[in-house]
């Protein structure tokens, strides 16, 4: 009789232990970057956006992400933006909050007042009157000043600088000036704190070996690559090969600095989505489903955390960008179908792909 009574208790204890194991926090290797870019999060919080776990319980997003093994947060910085978002004030405040949760800070200098990418590298308005020599001084002093406020763990000097930065002076067509301006920014970082790791960031992987040849005399630590199948090709094998070639050629650790994948091609507001067509996907391996998104990031993780090949980690871009302004917003999220949370702001399975298991 006692055995019969004890059996349900034993089953309950086993079930509890299974749930406990499933919900255990993940601690990833500290010498890898397992990151998310949360640059839009302060704006979302300001507009009262909220998030839920897969049990429909409201969560503290920062604690939740940390518990899932994410150890680094990437933040973009604009020089003099039109509002407070991505400003030095906002980024300083947010980075201090992130440090309280134990995150490392990856600071992404755009050296512009707005988005910098291969198509647009506009000089900040404050530097519009500069000649080349004065621009060198401005970049050095600005970089040093920002670091005195934030003191990050990683500094990205420029964003997707395939064609240069701070145009026209730093255009790749004037490669010696471009290289000298990058070198000036890197020296500002080294002279402030030589423990900060410096990254140079290239969009894609095709042509990257030739691009980084320009910077063999520059003192930096990491090569960052953006990888989105829409723009950078649908062959993950080619990505893997080119990352290995970069490491072998230049001896730098390689990071996938930006990536993302859709869990659906539907929309949750009235704002045009950047990714919305099947032709932009890697099919049939990775459909726009929750499972397809998970499988894609698992493969990115496999490629980017193989430290034998000099690979150092990855960062998911826009994971927080739910349709936080409501489903009628014309100025809402262009990325809600690539977020880490579904259209009810509930955590998707992909969130568990950030944890590096013993088998990875």
Question: In which residue ranges do the predicted regions lie?
Answer:
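N-terminal substrate-binding region of glycoside hydrolase catalytic domains
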Residues: 26-93, 97-99, 115-138, 224, ...
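Bacterial Sec-dependent N-terminal signal peptides
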Residues: 15-30
